[in-house]
Swiss-Prot record:
Gene Ontology biological-process entries: phosphatidylethanolamine biosynthetic process
NCBIfam families documented for this protein: PRK00723.1, PS_decarb
UniProt topology in membrane: Peripheral membrane protein
Main location: membrane
Cofactor remark: Binds 1 pyruvoyl group covalently per subunit.
InterPro entries: PS_Dcarbxylase, PSD-B, PSD_type2_pro
Residues annotated as site: Cleavage (non-hydrolytic): 255-256
HAMAP family: PS_decarb_PSD_B_type2 (MF_00663)
Listed name of the protein: Phosphatidylserine decarboxylase proenzyme
Pfam families in UniProt: PS_Dcarbxylase
Active site: 113 (charge relay system), 169 (charge relay system), 256 (charge relay system), 256 (schiff-base intermediate with substrate)
Catalytic activity: a 1,2-diacyl-sn-glycero-3-phospho-L-serine + H(+) = a 1,2-diacyl-sn-glycero-3-phosphoethanolamine + CO2
Organism: Desulfitobacterium hafniense (strain Y51)
């Protein structure tokens, strides 16, 4: 059971997890862990399933998925019959009216829909995965020089579960450098898996880039793939100016995670999100929603 904080109702909710029984069995039983290490975490397994979900025959999975998780397709650009495959449905675009971007330029907005954790004044060699498990930023991006820029900065972790909108966006205007790809495994990013696999983000396939934002400094963006995530698609053009809210990319099928690292004294996260993180709970947010503000120098 995964509890998260709904800041709109100020209550705790239970997440509906796609494939929950299978995830718990895989990461909690000896047989499941053996299968995980020999088959599930391998690229071939995710690539094959991704290939299937790109085929028209996978369309038959869409309607049961929508019904089971009570998804609102009225906010999607396409209707149910227009999706060419399950993946086409999975990384669906939303109507412009579906999400509103906080109008204040000093507001730090969420890059997408998902469950958010926030850590301030971070120790680069002791980043929190879950209580008791840590990793380092230089291990994560394999670039010690770049990692050192974010000493005592802020880290945001947005977890996208399979039922979420799976496109991610720029949180400010600016210019983004090309993405660096790092090969890796395909562990789940579900909290159950995060409690079982040490340095999971450093083990999984991932991509990172530096976004030179106009209002929040140089932001390190890291997209992490997961089980059955066939691809991390970057839809932006490197070195070209982007506007606040422009799409950066999207994930194909699977749960996924995006991490943002900010330099010291660039942002201040909303107190409720920081408090819930300290209590061990993620906060549910939507793309464009205010999650913090620009740090005002005195």
């Amino acid at each position: 059971m995964i509890k998260y904080y709904d800041r709109k109702t100020q209550t705790y909710q239970i997440e509906k997890v796609a494939g929950e029984k299978m995830i718990r069995w895989t990461y909690s039983s000896p047989v499941g862990m053996r299968l995980l290490e020999t088959v599930v975490k391998k690229r071939m397994c995710s690539s094959f399933y991704g290939w299937y979900l790109d085929r028209p025959i996978s369309r038959r999975k869409i309607h049961p998925f929508v019904c089971k998780f009570d998804l609102d397709l009225s906010i999607a650009e396409k209707n149910l019959k227009e999706f060419s495959s399950f993946n086409d449905f999975f990384y669906r675009k939303l109507k412009p009216s579906a999400r509103s971007i906080d109008p204040c330029q000093d507001s730090l907005i969420s890059l997408g829909d998902g469950k958010l954790l926030a850590y301030e004044d971070i120790d680069l060699d002791c980043l929190v995965q879950v209580k008791g498990l840590t990793y380092s930023l230089k291990e994560l991006i394999k670039d010690p020089e770049t990692a050192s820029k974010y000493k005592r900065g802020t880290c945001l972790i947005l977890r996208l579960c399979p039922t979420d909108y799976h496109r991610f966006h720029f949180i400010d205007s600016g210019i983004c450098e090309p993405s660096h790809r790092i090969k890796g495994s395909y562990y789940s990013v579900n909290p159950v898996a995060l409690q079982k696999v040490a340095k999971l983000f450093c083990e999984n396939k991932r991509e990172w880039s530096i976004f030179h934002s106009d209002h929040f400094g140089d932001i390190l963006t890291i997209e992490v793939g997961a089980t059955f995530v066939g691809s991390i698609i970057q839809s932006y053009t490197p070195h070209q100016p982007v506007a606040r809210g422009d799409e950066k990319g999207y994930f194909k099928f699977g749960g996924s995670t995006v991490l943002l690292f900010f330099e010291e004294n660039k942002i201040k996260i909303d107190p409720d999100i920081v408090e819930q993180t300290k209590l061990g709970y993620e906060t549910y947010v939507l793309f464009g929603e205010k999650v913090g503000v620009r740090h005002k120098r005195r």
